[in-house]
Amino acid sequence: MGMRMMFTVFLLVVLATTVVSFTLDRASDGANAAADLVARGIRGNCCMFHTCPIDYSRFYCP
């Protein structure tokens, strides 16, 4: 296999990897939202006071 052919195969592999990665990333948008809520609850940094959505929105677990 010549250098030109190896370079072409390399470019095809990179292109295929990029396309697959991009497609999988778009398909998983928002899929981890429930897992994030569970992880925050397990870690114990949820704020359960009624003012938390206003004051500490990143720690609020609905």
UniProtKB/Swiss-Prot annotation:
InterPro entries the record matches: Conotoxin_a-typ
Signal peptide segment: 1-21
UniProt keyword annotation of Zinc-finger present: no
Regions annotated as coiled coil: none
GO-annotated molecular function: acetylcholine receptor inhibitor activity; ion channel regulator activity; toxin activity
Record keywords, A-Z: Disulfide bond, Ion channel impairing toxin, Neurotoxin, Secreted, Signal, Toxin
Localization terms from the record: Secreted
Predominant cellular place of this UniProt entry's protein: secreted
Tissues of expression: Expressed by the venom duct.
UniProt remark on domains: The cysteine framework is I (CC-C-C). Alpha4/8 pattern.
Family, similarity comment: Belongs to the conotoxin A superfamily.
Its job: Probable neurotoxin with unknown target. Possibly targets ion channels.
Additional detail: Negative results: does not show activity on a range of nAChRs (alpha-3-beta-2/CHRNA3-CHRNB2, alpha-4-beta-2/CHRNA4-CHRNB2, and alpha-7/CHRNA7), calcium and sodium channels.
Protein name: Conotoxin Pl168
